[in-house]
């Protein structure tokens, strides 16, 4: 095993000039309430997505903790789903190139992996690195998703009104990328979508849409989200039917709506200072969600 971060990845020598591109990262393995990050990633990868860099998964992946799938066909093994951690080249609706780091979150060597990402950013001339998150929070599905933005320089999101104070949550490799690269002078952003707690284990494309729209607003990319909009419309109708069929859910949603509307009216924005969960409450919700995921595995 090498200690040189450059040995953790292979970079395509035939890649085009990507100077000034944005790098998004959506690693599997951390909190993804409502599968919002997975849905956003799938939307981005739906078209042509050639790989420009591959990471050495054998050094980073714990195969016994997250076992890959093998396929058996009658009397022989027919296929193996090899874990892949790679940087894909994508284009927006204006044919502007951007990059997406996707795959399993490393189980080991986080610092070396983060240093390797920093090297890639330097080699490729990336101008900004953006990570996506989705976490459970006491908001209703019937109101706009109150996106949370954070980053290395306040100038990157000067129009955003921060409402969280100090908070401690379980770390992720994606968060470490934002922290280490930001400390090194690289522009980094994190965009997070709160998801209603009653939808945390389901698919909630509304949150995925909110993430991608915020990416566009912060980076200037014109992302095609039309397919996700179609899915979201049908999903919201199904959620509304399920809620209306349950007195308990109906009461919960109504209570969350009152809380949300009171907060929004007080601050004239989707996120206000008094009535949403405190940092401690949010941290507790994240801990509970992670514990539920671990039990599910």
Identify the meaning behind each predicted range:
Residues 2-103:
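N-terminal short beta-loop-beta anion/metal-coordinating cradle
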Residues 35-39, 108, 112, 172, ...:
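Conserved active-site and cofactor/substrate-binding residues in soluble primary-metabolism enzymes
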Residues 38-45, 118, 174-178, 182, ...:
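Predominant activation on well-ordered alpha-helical scaffold segments within soluble catalytic domains
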Residues 53, 99-101, 130, 187-192:
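Hydrophobic/aromatic beta-strand patches that form the interior of the parallel beta-sheet core
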Residues 99-104, 159-163:
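Short acidic, glycine/Ser/Thr-rich loop/turn "cap" segments at secondary-structure junctions
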Residues 199-297:
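A conserved C-terminal secondary-structure "cap"
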